[in-house]
Design a protein with these regions (language model features):
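A short, Trp-centered hydrophobic/proline-enriched beta-strand micro-motif
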Residues: 6-21, 59-63
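A generic structural signal for short beta-strands and their flanking turns/coil linkers
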Residues: 10-12, 35-37, 55-59, 69-75, ...
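Short glycine/serine/proline-enriched coil/turn segments at secondary-structure junctions
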Residues: 23, 67-69, 120
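Hydrophobic residues embedded in beta-strands of well-ordered beta-sheets
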Residues: 24, 38-39, 117
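Hydrophobic/aromatic beta-strand elements that line small-molecule binding cavities or substrate pockets
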Residues: 29-32, 75-77
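A short mixed-secondary-structure module that forms the rim of ligand-binding clefts
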Residues: 32-67
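Charged, gly/pro-rich active-site loop segments
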Residues: 72-130
Length: 130
């Protein structure tokens, strides 16, 4: 898992895809943390992304590694409501503390079950990393 977290942190911004009915929706994300050997992300339960995940919990994200290499990760969203997980996200990304706290009701953290991660290149076959 560390490899995925490291790549996402190095890329600084990665793109997170959901579906809205039969339409794809993609948005930039910039926060990820590893906690208890899982890769965690966050959302706000008042957003369209949260509603879309509720309707279809399968998501994919993509991050550039270099000019010709990128990471793709997909899986099923599983929310984790424990305050200690929220606090880990806040500690890793202090900029979120101006919007959220570990005990508020809109800050949602989640990991991906059955997560699959692959590194792609225009010059070689995909490398499965999890």
């Amino acid at each position: 898992m560390n490899r995925i977290v490291n790549i996402l942190n190095q890329s600084k911004i990665f793109f997170f895809a959901t579906t809205d009915g039969n339409q794809p929706r993609v948005r930039p994300y910039n926060a990820v943390v590893e906690f208890e050997d899982k890769v965690y992300f966050y959302t706000n339960n008042h957003t369209r992304a949260f509603r879309q995940i509720s309707e279809n919990p399968f998501i994919e994200l993509c991050a550039m590694i270099s000019e010709d290499r990128w990471l793709r990760v997909n899986g099923k969203v599983v929310y984790d409501y424990r305050p200690e997980v929220k606090q880990a996200m806040l500690d890793a990304h202090p900029e979120l503390k101006s919007m959220y706290s570990a005990d508020d009701k809109i800050f949602e953290v989640f990991y991906l079950s059955n997560m699959q991660g692959t590194i792609h290149s225009n010059h070689s076959e995909p490398e499965v990393i999890c």
